[in-house]
A protein has these predicted regions:
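Internal gly/pro-rich beta-alpha loop/helix module
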Residues: 121-123, 128-222
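Small-residue (G/A/S/T)-rich helix-start motifs and N-terminal tracts that mark the onset
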Residues: 1-82, 88, 193-348, 352, ...
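Amphipathic alpha-helical segments in well-structured domains
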Residues: 94-95, 141-145, 180, 334-337, ...
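Short acidic loop-to-helix transition motifs that present clustered carboxylates
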Residues: 112-114, 160-166, 191, 306-308, ...
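N-terminal small/polar loop signature for handling phosphorylated ligands or for N-terminal nucleophile
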Residues: 64-149, 289-301, 310-313
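A structural motif corresponding to the C-terminal end of an alpha-helix
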Residues: 103-104, 150-153, 405-408
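Short acidic-hydrophobic sequence patches enriched in Asp/Glu that either
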Residues: 87-90, 140, 175-178, 283, ...
Length: 504
């Protein structure tokens, strides 16, 4: 699914109108029918409905929905905000249709509003502002939003909660954004809907197909998109009947320190489960027995030190290197790490403590080879970028800038993990769940991507497929085990089922 900007959304509407062809009013009617069906699936006609409509096309949608709900037996009250006596043409047309129907209680607001009482039984339809909003709400609209938010009523937002902007909300006034129970967005998700700090406004999110031009959608370039199963399935390589361990890739993982051997175990197991033919784990001597017992399929390469990573490893014989899980941040380890990164001769994944070491030695990042893969969680990235208290959108844009500057791939982990490409493109992962918010989950991702690289996947494809497999395995595990008790080992256990799902 492509994620269009507000300007592109406007162009998509315009193109559909011109090339279907269909009038803008009839397109609004089509959208309103889809919205009405979705509302009626959730609430019966015994639910009192209060519609708040703005002066633009989002308000026009809301007026059309009000008319359709009233025709289906709902008790509907409508409040149309027309303070400047300036309605959009389609909003004005739907105002006339609504008044002609004579089924609803209609109030047009031209000065101050004495707001209606909203109780727990009330359903509010929020049609104040849509995806064209480009500045924070203020004045009477802000007061109206606060009034709705303070009420116990359920709220359905049309396309996007009023006050929430389509892209960047870093400088928005968060008290002036509707907190919806359900958001019914039209055709495609918006970028702001993928940001964790905006989830409090969306409630449940549904995407409604209103049959906008598929030709425009397919042919229009965009910076951001959500990767879905149909995008991922073609990336999966077929396995030759004549494959042997030498042809399936040789991976090296540098992971673990004293007390953190589990990180090495998880990354190594995940790498093996991803189909790498041979996996070598480089780890401190003290971890020997744990690793030998926990992952008998792996080859062990012991560091000279008992408890830390202390010396770079020759990577000539390896097809991919993953470094960082449980590594520790000892100064000796830091020096060994930069030496290792400088001399790496194969595709490289950097995670966890390796990222934390780079955060403390930021100048070293300029010495990194091109096309490396970095997999920070938000706090790791903030340390890496020297940035504190970023909004999710700011963090994403900084990750994209860093990926371009370093010519690297950066996976910013989260509910919608974001893959930032060296060319500025951003891919969001559609799989994964909150049960995966558990220690070791990131180590598993490092192992998966390292395994895919070893098997010969390009960095771009290893990231896309790795993110999807990681999240899909977590989703399949959560379906069987529940989210509450999910642990990182479960993700590894369900990797085979994730592969089978993609092979169907």
């Amino acid at each position: 699914m492509k994620i269009f900007t507000s300007a592109q959304i406007h162009e998509l509407d315009k193109y559909t109108i011109e090339h279907e062809p269909i009038s803008s009013l009839n397109l609004m009617e089509r959208a309103a029918k889809a919205l009405t069906r979705a509302i009626e699936e959730e609430w019966s006609n015994r639910t009192p409905v209060v519609v708040f409509a703005g002066p633009g096309n989002n308000g026009g949608d809301a007026l059309a929905v009000a008319r359709m709900l009233s025709e289906d037996g709902y008790d509907v009250s409508v409040y149309l905000f027309n303070v400047q006596n300036k309605l959009s043409a389609d909003c004005l047309a739907n105002r006339k249709r609504l008044l002609d129907a004579k089924r609803v209680k209609f109030t047009e607001i031209t000065t101050n509003l004495d707001p209606p009482k909203l109780n727990a039984e009330t359903l509010v339809v929020d049609g104040l502002f849509g995806s064209g909003l480009n500045k924070p709400l203020a004045g009477g609209f802000a007061a109206m939003v606060k009034y709705i938010n303070q009420s116990p009523a359920k709220v359905v937002s049309i396309d996007i909660p009023s006050g929430l902007m389509t892209e960047d909300n870093s400088y928005n006034i968060h008290a002036n954004i509707i907190r919806a129970t359900l958001t019914l967005t039209l055709q495609q998700k918006k970028l702001s809907m993928l940001m964790a700090d905006n989830q409090q406004y969306l409630g449940r999110l549904r995407v409604l197909d209103i049959r906008l031009s598929q030709e425009f959608i397919q042919n229009t370039e965009c910076r951001c998109r959500i990767l879905e199963e149909n995008d991922i399935r073609p990336l999966l390589k077929s396995r030759s009947d004549f494959a042997h361990k030498g042809s399936m890739g040789n991976a090296l993982l540098i992971a673990g320190s004293y007390g953190m051997s589990g990180a090495s175990v998880l990354a190594t197991k995940a790498c093996l489960r991803t189909g790498a033919g041979k996996v070598t784990a480089h780890t401190p001597k003290r971890n020997y027995e744990i690793m030998q017992i926990s992952v008998p399929e792996a080859v062990l390469q012991m560091d000279a030190e008992e408890t830390i990573f202390s010396e770079p490893v020759d990577t000539e014989m390896f097809d991919a290197l993953g470094v960082g899980p449980g590594l520790g941040q000892n100064e000796t380890t830091a020096i060994a790490l930069i030496a290792q990164l400088r001399r790496a001769t194969c595709p490289l994944v950097i995670d966890a403590d390796a990222l934390n070491i780079l955060s403390s030695h930021r100048a070293w990042m300029q010495q990194l080879p091109k096309n490396i893969i970095m997999t920070p969680h938000p706090k790791e990235f903030d340390r890496l970028a020297g940035n504190a208290n970023s909004s999710c959108t700011e963090r994403l844009m900084k990750a994209s800038e860093l990926a371009e500057r370093l010519q690297a791939y950066i996976i910013l982990k989260g509910h919608y993990s974001a893959l930032c490409h060296p060319d500025g493109k951003i891919d969001f992962c559609s799989t994964g769940n909150s049960g995966m918010a558990t220690a070791g989950s990131g180590d598993v991702l490092t192992g998966i991507i390292t395994g895919l690289l070893a098997r010969g996947y390009k960095q771009e494809d290893a990231c896309r497929l790795g993110m999807h497999l990681h999240g899909l395995a977590g989703d399949l595990a959560a379906k069987d085990l529940g989210k509450e008790s999910l642990i990182a080992s479960d993700i590894i256990q369900y990797l085979p089922k994730a592969f089978l799902r993609l092979e169907e």
